[in-house]
């Protein structure tokens, strides 16, 4: 059928991918489409494996178009020094912050990353900023990012500078992390109910949460051989 690509035919696939690159270049540079520039950067990264060109397009799309997804991707490049960029956590933090605040497909991931970098302290002269970390973990947790919910539970479980210990909030965020599939969220909530640690003791809930943690752990082990580490 006309228009369909035979993906078993190497020449057809090559022509298709070349045309795709041309189309995305036109969208980006001629039509000035921010989404087109983001697609072009992804094309260079995923198809051509040309990370330097991808980084260049991402910078253009951030500087000229303030594209949320490109800010997220550029931030990830700065974290690892990808595409010939220097490892620069402050630049990464700035990119993630802009992506988080602008909204978009990767904004929740970006909010979580802002929390991680603020918590780490290396973007603030080696001084951890627990309050900023909490605020951005909250944004990500509100968007159902399980790891941020768990990090909030750990923060309230232990307390931090500017954040008093709060066992009720620790339990709330542990249970939310658990509901989103975070094994340790389930395990921590189970332990709190089992020991009556700052909350009313409840053996039934403790057992239920422990079983969910076990089930999630088993599911993760079954999936692990098929998962490769991404960015």
From Swiss-Prot:
Sel1-like repeat residue numbers: 34-66, 68-104, 108-145, 146-182, 183-218
Compartmental location: Mitochondrion intermembrane space
InterPro entries in UniProt: HcpB-like, Sel1-like, TPR-like_helical_dom_sf
GO cellular component, one term: mitochondrial intermembrane space
Keyword terms: Mitochondrion, Repeat
Main location: mitochondrion
Any Pfam family hit: Sel1
Keyword Mitochondrion part of the UniProt annotation: yes
Family under the similarity heading: Belongs to the hcp beta-lactamase family.
Function: May be required for assembly of mitochondrial respiratory chain complexes.
Record's protein name: Cytochrome c oxidase assembly factor 7A
């Amino acid at each position: 059928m006309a228009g369909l690509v035979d993906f078993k035919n190497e020449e057809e696939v090559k022509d298709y991918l070349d045309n795709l690159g041309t189309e995305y270049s036109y969208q980006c540079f001629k039509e000035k489409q921010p989404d087109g520039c983001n697609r072009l950067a992804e094309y260079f990264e995923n198809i051509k494996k040309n990370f330097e060109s991808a980084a260049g397009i991402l910078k253009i799309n951030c500087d000229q178009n303030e594209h949320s997804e490109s800010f997220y991707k550029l931030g990830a490049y700065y974290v690892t020094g990808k595409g010939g960029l220097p490892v620069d956590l402050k630049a990464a933090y700035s990119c993630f912050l802009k992506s988080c605040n602008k909204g978009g497909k990767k904004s929740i991931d970006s909010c979580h990353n802002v929390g991680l970098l603020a918590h780490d302290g290396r973007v603030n002269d080696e001084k951890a900023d627990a309050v900023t970390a909490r605020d951005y973990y909250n944004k990500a947790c509100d968007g159902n990012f399980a790891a941020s919910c768990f990090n909030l539970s750990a923060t309230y479980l232990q307390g931090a500078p500017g954040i008093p210990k709060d066992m009720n909030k620790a339990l709330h965020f542990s249970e939310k992390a658990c509901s989103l599939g975070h094994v340790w969220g389930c395990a921590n909530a189970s332990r709190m109910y089992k020991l009556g640690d700052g909350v009313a003791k409840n053996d039934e809930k403790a057992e239920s949460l422990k079983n969910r943690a076990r089930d999630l752990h088993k599911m993760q082990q079954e999936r692990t051989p098929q998962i490769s580490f991404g960015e």
